[in-house]
Amino acid sequence: MNSLVGDVPQSLSSLDDTTTCYNLDASCNKSLVEERPSKILKTTHISPNLHPFSSSNPPPPKHQPSSRILSFEKTGLHVMNHNSPNLIFSPKDEEIGLPEHKKAELIIRGTKRAQSLTRSQSNAQDHILAERKRREKLTQRFVALSALIPGLKKMDKASVLGDAIKHIKYLQESVKEYEEQKKEKTMESVVLVKKSSLVLDENHQPSSSSSSDGNRNSSSSNLPEIEVRVSGKDVLIKILCEKQKGNVIKIMGEIEKLGLSITNSNVLPFGPTFDISIIAQKNNNFDMKIEDVVKNLSFGLSKLT
């Protein structure tokens, strides 16, 4: 019995040793799992004496990972350790680390940004001043326009523009009517002047007399009666002459000599005479007065008798 009791502590001690060894193996395996590197490099040589870890073979020493900072610059790749005592950065240190031309570029960029901001502010103020001046001019012109419109009741811009348009249209119509009346008056005065005919005396000196005058002397009995009317470039010539062969052609020739182009002609026999109506146009070189046309036609046609 005593032997059995003596054997129990030994068995318990051996069990403790086994448990301790088992715990040691578990902790070793756990440390191996935790401390295994993130990437295993391939090797070309395999050692034949590679055995699994056991209690007799101690585990390899723990490898403490060290964090590093990669600094990318043009000079190359630099690796910095966090454990370094001088690992303190500031913007000034970064600027000091830049080359001189980089610093100059940064300074130029900052200057350009400041200048562009100043220019944009000055441009905005100039635009505001220009817009203010433009509105002042526009207001002044509206005031001046409203002073020219008679009977203006409202002073707002829409009313001023509407009444101005109406007044301008009224003035245009008045000008057209005035021009038409002026043309009619000019035509009447031309007709009165052209109704006078020229009579040549015995000395071939022209003397004016009315075409409606029935008292004719013997020297004017054979002369044709001439009436001329002018409207712009159009000339209407009416001639009453004796009925003779060739007179019509000769009369047209005399008219063309004066710088007139005949566009239409009409000849009607009236008793012993011809009533000739001719419409002609002034040429570019025509610069004669109405009286001169009558005189030259009378003098040229007097040779026909």
UniProtKB/Swiss-Prot annotation:
Pfam families from the UniProt entry: bHLH-TF_ACT-like_plant, HLH
GO molecular function, one term: DNA binding
Region of interest (Disordered), ranges: 41-67, 201-224
SUPFAM superfamilies: HLH, helix-loop-helix DNA-binding domain (SSF47459)
Skewed-composition ranges (Low complexity): 207-222
Subcellular location: Nucleus
InterPro entries: bHLH-TF_ACT-like_plant (IPR054502), bHLH_dom (IPR011598), bHLH_transcription_regulator (IPR052610), HLH_DNA-bd_sf (IPR036638)
GO cellular component terms, semicolon-separated: nucleus
Biased composition (Polar residues): 44-56
Keywords: DNA-binding, Nucleus, Transcription, Transcription regulation
Tissues/organs with expression: Expressed in roots.
Primary localisation category: nucleus
Keyword DNA-binding attached: yes
Keyword Electron transport: no
Subunit structure: Homodimer.
Protein name: Transcription factor bHLH18
Taxon lineage: Eukaryota, Viridiplantae, Streptophyta, Embryophyta, Tracheophyta
Protein encoded by which gene: BHLH18
